[in-house]
Regions:
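C-terminal segment of classical bacterial N-terminal signal peptides
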Residues: 14-22
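Sec-dependent signal peptide recognition
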Residues: 2-10, 14
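A residue-level marker of the well-folded mature domains of exported/periplasmic proteins
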Residues: 3-6, 21-342
């Protein structure tokens, strides 16, 4: 994980291809897990733009959080003539059948953001363990001890475990020493904010509201957590990630401590460019910036690219404004005093 490639917007590393190389054009099929979360729409726009800029055709399907539908979606994308597939998996355990279908047709696969632990798939994501570390470090700096709750993502998503591993690297020693006590920890079906809110409500009830900080594994769930806290009149440090617009506004308002921004535009563009190269017949080892990685649960060695995330707090809200990720009036609405950029 030390060989991390920074592909944020405006970075020096750009995956380039000539127009001539795509004179005939290829078809890039994208299987999305679901569009429930705000961020995937941003990813899609960037990915589609990159694919079309390369002279290729974008086709897609939305699995609507169903692993079974994702398999039929992949079959449909193959039938429509996809020359390469980008898959944001619903369930890491079930997606193998989709990879088998693609491999049988000689179609390369890019596992997008979520790990598909199969050496036939290229892996493109952010450094999710690093994201977990950043969330925990930022919250711990504000609340170095006391009762913590951890709201994890979906149990079937490897990212939930990578994020947790990163968090525990930061707070694990303090947990063992008794400085930090984990009073509640729960997986959240589908990463859904409503489910996260229910999980947090149950933790608050069990802990008699004695919770001092919350580590949430994404911004949508952080929103659910904060709703549960607000209902009890609590305002405590809460960390999340994705750089969702609503979360960034919560950071400015002071109800969320940090949102680790993973620039979806950079990830989407990189996916479009990598898929184009794979569709043209380049091997995974020929992808610029690719590294060998075997940090998954099964230890499978894979070709991967990891992008660097950026923590956003009240001290650097200006970063997302300056990058054009969110308008100043939107992020700064109701902002507390002392927010840099507002």
């Amino acid at each position: 994980m030390k060989s991390i490639i920074n592909l944020l917007a405006g970075s020096a590393i750009v995956l380039t291809m000539t127009t001539a190389a795509f004179a005939d054009g290829n078809v890039i099929g994208v299987s999305w897990s679901n569009f429930q979360e705000e961020r995937w729409k941003t990813d899609e726009a960037a990915m589609k733009a990159a694919i079309e800029a390369n002279g290729d055709t974008y086709i897609s399907a939305d699995a609507q959080a169903s692993a079974a539908k994702q398999l039929t979606d992949v079959e449909s994308l193959i039938a429509q003539g996809a020359n390469a597939l980008v898959i944001l998996s619903v369930d890491s355990g079930a997606v193998g059948a989709a990879v088998d279908k693609a491999a049988a047709e000689g179609i390369p696969v890019l596992g997008y953001d979520r790990l598909i632990e199969d050496d036939r798939a290229f892996y493109l994501t952010f450094d999710n363990k690093g994201v977990g570390r950043i969330i925990a470090e930022t919250v711990k700096a504000v609340q170095p001890e006391g009762n913590y709750a951890i709201i994890k993502g979906d149990k079937g998503d490897p990212n939930a475990l990578f994020l947790l591993e990163g968090m525990m690297e930061v707070i694990g020693a303090d947990v063992e020493a008794g400085k930090i006590k984990i009073v509640g920890e729960a997986f959240t079906d589908g990463w859904k904010p409503d489910n996260a809110q229910k999980n947090m409500e149950q933790i608050l009830t069990a802990a008699d509201n004695k919770v001092d900080a919350v580590l949430a594994e994404n911004d949508g769930m952080a929103g659910g957590v904060i709703a549960a806290l607000s209902a009890q009149g609590l305002n405590i440090p809460v960390g999340g990630q994705d750089g969702d617009h609503a979360a960034l506004n919560r950071v400015a308002r002071g109800t969320q401590t940090v949102s680790v921004w993973k620039d979806a535009r950079a990830l989407g563009k990189a996916a479009g460019d990598i898929a184009a190269m794979l569709a043209e017949g380049k091997s995974m080892t020929e992808i610029p910036g690719a590294v060998k990685w075997s940090g998954g649960a099964k230890g499978v060695e894979m070709n991967a690219i990891f992008l660097d995330p950026t923590p956003i707090t009240k001290d650097n809200i200006n970063v997302v404004i300056d990058a054009g990720h969110i308008a100043k009036d939107k992020v700064c609405e109701g902002a507390m005093d002392g927010v840099n950029g507002c």
